């Protein structure tokens, strides 16, 4: 018994034979790719971040990544080292890579021909027998397969862009966490110096009171400085521990990881800040999130076309049939069977209206997203510029002034014009100004990271 073959084509005026051949060709090429769509993510990561990213689907790939991570951990980490470790080792990122595998499976499935259905009906009342055999094909599904396959391809591209955004977000988070961790470690060192100076002042005050050379009020002042310094040191150590733990988590390192080394200091401020890039060009050419929304918009256009194409007919099954009626052994009667849904109560109007509303909604959201992207870049640049000015002023004005004051008071102390407590207070103030400078440098590098992320399309900044 010959069976007609089925496939899917875009609804058009092309002859049925051409449509069938198109579907056969589509079904024949619906196979899995070697890279699972990951090569484009890897190449764009290399272009935008100059970093390696690897989808570890085998034990060999996992071992290669582990070896690269171990090599980086052998030396004091720089910011870009931490980013590279995160891109290789973060398991949440690996889970997002698996979305590519899920999406590719959907893509391949969308190109497969629908399975035929076989129906057998047997009834007998001696000496009569009634046997009906039917092999049917969902012709509508076959005719819309090219539409569905094209939609699946766009969804696959959408997933690739979403995965790339996840890569950029992780890189940005890790870079900021690194700057925070280094600044927190530096802050602990300076707070320890402040606490040591305050402790010396409190001890000296206690001895002078015991010798009858000082009053209890002045001693209480020194003791309060010492207590406050101890509290700030505890807070700094907590901040250091939390910042370090966050960096460990983003890099995908376990809590029992041997102590890794961070750089001793934050990078120095650059000589000058970068100019604001052309926002229109940056938004249209660099923003991955806008590219993703554009892909989603194109997908809705395709969905709208598919809805229009299948508006009136939702079920159309065609297939050969043969029937045997009469005494057992009677010849079969051959023919065909068509199952057609009659759009009597539902002509597809609500589905079409819904698809049109979804498309209109997507257009408005895409337009607003472009406006938001421009605003985000301007805000990020303003924060970047202000952070640079603040850090530069701390470095060039505040810290030198505090150092000069301390030097002058040392001369006055040598001339017996000020007390040792004045020197200790100056030391505390000078160290505090250096700590403020460290925090301002940290804020600058974080602002720089947020600006870079805004230009690339990380809308979470």
What are these model-predicted stretches?
Residues 29-53, 84-141, 244-253, 280-365, ...:
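A small-residue-enriched
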Residues 91, 213, 288, 312, ...:
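Residue-level recognition of short, well-ordered coil/turn positions
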Residues 2-88, 237-282, 452-461:
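Terminal intrinsically disordered/low-complexity segments used for targeting and assembly
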